[in-house]
Amino acid sequence: MTTVSKQKSNLLEQFNETRTRTLSLVQTLEKDDFIVQTATFMSPPKWHLGHVSWLLEVVMSKTVSNYEFYSQEFSEYLNSYYHQFGEPHDKDKRGLATRPTVDQIFEYFHMITNKATNILQNELLDEKTQQLFFMAINHECQHQELLVYDLQHLLADRYRPLVRNSLPAPSQQESSSIKINGGLYMMGYSGDQFCYDIELPEHKVYLDDYKIDSFPVTNKQYMKFVEDGGYDDFKYWLSDGWDKIRNENWKTPMYWKKIDGQWMTCDFLGNRKVNPNEPVCHVSYYEADAYCKWAGKRLPTEAEWEKAACWDEKNQRKTIFPWGNESPDPIHANLLESYLWNCSEIGAYPNGKSHYGCHQMIGDVWEWTSTEFSGYPKFKTGFSEYNDKWFANQKVLRGGSFGTPSISIRGSYRNFFRLDERWLFSGFRCAEYI
């Protein structure tokens, strides 16, 4: 089998797995659940189902001569932000539209699946076309994760996943600070599989010596910041962050409440006590930065984060993942296919630690870095309006979360969000100058 044929076979396999997983995430929902938008930052489940199918139509329109979109009405509703295809529907009004109906969206989903499958099975696809379909698959994986965020906000423990596995055994690990030697580091994706344009090209960066924590910051550590009055002291906060927490009355991470003197949270496991040994989750960049200042530390740059995650000092090589080049599985990290629906305690994945000894750099929580999101030197866009239009007012996060599909994460993967967003599964780890 030729390399191109192998890639096409892998493409079809990933496509089938991804479409199946999307349906599995919504299989237990009631029809009424599909249309609700509980906040302006989330989207109704039916919109996610339709949008990932519409993006497949976008790809097919770029690869099939004289392609006609299924419906102008559908395109207008399902277009997120692609002005080249018309005026996008307002995000904060996605829950106000009763048409297309839920049944129509499901019919559309299956029709587009069949149409794309026919192309993937029967057409001769050049490398550029295959990369576009890989992009569409990875785009759907991104929306699977966004859907998981939204399902937690919508339903919490009333969501009944098809599969729920037991969390790993509790750990008694304590975080330590690991020294990383500086020097030149080749940053970016170095593999031969799909990656996004923003992970390329590989390029040299210079790093000074630094320290980085072996674990993400835990709930126990973050509680001390909260209880020490961290949210009430302006000296820890960026100006915009200080305005944000006062205007929104933020006093804790999202979902935390103090009831009868006990810190509680509400998530897929229900209303429960905050587990002190889990990574803190649902914090914004502002909160992560403020904590680091309070602790006398700082957030790592994304280059520092990537080197700590992927550089093998002993063998002088870079690996795709912290543990090596093997694809992720539940032994290495807590990702979507682990189906735990929650963060694991720190130290739960010794087989997934980096060559330097940093744990849980893949999975559990996305980790904020101090780096502004922009293109690497000599960046070339791979798909207009997909990533490069966001090169302003965003910070880079690394590592994935328990909602991230395993095929869409690696040590070089760059996520990005605005500094005030925190409904995602976001945490952080601290770094220090030496």
Language model features: what each stretch is:
Residues 1-6, 118-121, 165-169, 247:
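Polar low-complexity intrinsically disordered regions
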Residues 2-43, 47-54, 58-115, 119, ...:
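Disulfide-stabilized, aromatic/cysteine-rich ligand-recognition loop
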Residues 132, 136, 140-142, 146, ...:
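Functional-site microenvironments in short loops/helix caps that host divalent-cation chemistry
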